[in-house]
Amino acid sequence: VEHAFLSNGSDVNNFLKTESGLKKLGVADATGIARYLGLQKMGVRVNVPEGTYTLDSVLASGKGIKISNDLFTSGAGTVLSTKKENISSQRFEIVSIGNGYYNIIAEHSGKALQAVGDGKAGYAYIEQRERNSALEAQKWCFIDAGNGTYYIMSALNTCIDIHSGVTSDGNTVWTYTCNQSN
């Protein structure tokens, strides 16, 4: 038991024998914490080939991420959009920055996708910003979701997600607590 004084060994042993006693002491292991919070293990983090891609939605067939209104400016957000040929605001360059992380660069603007905020709220909006590979908010990794699809997770531990699961064009694409949903 970490941070406990053993001035009365019998009390400590009584607490350690029952789950309710452990809860009173605040003792838990990672498995117990995950079970209590209802967390599940996600797929394996994988390396992906660098290149230019569209970031397609599994939830909404024929749709993917694009920069809102095809803007070039820093601060422009990401939205869901019907995929169209030759729309550079729907294409993103995936660039390895080491340690399994990548920058995701909007082809039309050359700016990096960045989760806005510290991620502590469980969600963050995504904007394009000047590229700075040192920023945690611009670091992304890919988690195998099976069937050739991936969850894209920020270094802030939130995953790219369609806001409220609404699949209409123009709906916000943001990061949200990784929940293994489409």
PLM regions: where:
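Active-site-adjacent mobile loop/cap segments within catalytic or ligand-binding domains
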Residues: V1-V44
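Lectin-like carbohydrate-binding module/patch detector with strong preference for beta-trefoil
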Residues: R45-N182
